[in-house]
Amino acid sequence: MIKVGIVGAAGYAAGELIRVLLNHPQAEIVFANSGSNAGNLFSDVHEGLLGDTDFRFTDELPFEKIDVLFICLGHGKSEEFLKNNPVPANVKIIDFAQDFRIAAPGNDYVYGLPETHRSLIAKAQHVANPGCFATCIQLALLPLAKAGVLKGDVVINAITGSTGAGVKPQSTTHFSWRNGNMSVYKVFTHQHLLEINQSIREFQPDFGGDLDFVPYRGDFARGIFTTVFMRTGLSQEEIDKCYSMYAGEPFTHYVSRDIDLKQVVNTNRALVHAQKYGDRLLVTSVIDNLLKGAAGQAVENMNIMFGIAEDAGLKLKAAAF
């Protein structure tokens, strides 16, 4: 069994991580650290776990008992945590924050998008789990970048559920504001653009266009729906060939019909659809922001790092209705 530790275990993504790991056939939670909830049952915080476990949160960090550590702290806090709490070299780390996603001297974290970095993840000691928007958008764009056919500016619109903002209450996550409402935020400046641009230029270094990304807050709890628009001279057949890279993928599927959120919510699945309209190309992609956009993808990365079946613990069914 893979012995697991979790830090920052009280958030939404951590709750999904716990849910997945409790049902994982080859992993066992050793500790789940949450200073503000030490001694409380998992189900006191993650109420959907009621009846599933009598495990309790702890304020301890017994690193010597684990094989892998999931860090589920807020952005900018992971690096500080690791400086103050050195983790033994033999313990693998999967970080949920953006602290290690951007390549830099001394940063040995592999970017954890399995569809493009599987072989590197398999050999990695440390993995930076991609952001939720970044995952959904890259799955729409990277097949074109890998084929070297992205040209000109790319317009991206993506709408996310309220869980993407985290568990701490904010004015823009309050039910009476969010319900029946939509809004934009961080227009053209969202932090996930850094990792998206990094990946595109990794596969297509000569791409010179802009990524014009407008994020939206949706009036639903979970999921991301992305549309990507660009001009192209490619035929539909050539476009389909680019996305054939997803053939055989355990979770990401290229489909020939329109897609919707309910097909992926509560799963680690990603769906991508690309359709040509004259000289215009529209690519749509959908994921669950808490699973393929966070906890599910983190477990997928763990599975790859330990050489077990990539879908272990992740055979989840969409709600559908």
Regions found by a protein language model. Give the residues of each.
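N-terminal Rossmann-like NAD(P) cofactor-binding subdomain of oxidoreductases
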Residues: 1-180, 185-187, 205-206, 273-277, ...
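Predominant activation on well-ordered alpha-helical scaffold segments within soluble catalytic domains
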Residues: 18, 138-145, 193-197, 240, ...
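Short Gly/Pro-enriched turn/cap motifs at secondary-structure boundaries
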Residues: 184-188, 216-218, 260-264
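C-terminal active-site/capping subdomain that shapes the small-molecule cofactor and substrate pocket
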Residues: 229-321
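Short, solvent-exposed beta-strand edge segments and adjacent coil->beta transition regions
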Residues: 124, 182, 223-227, 280-282
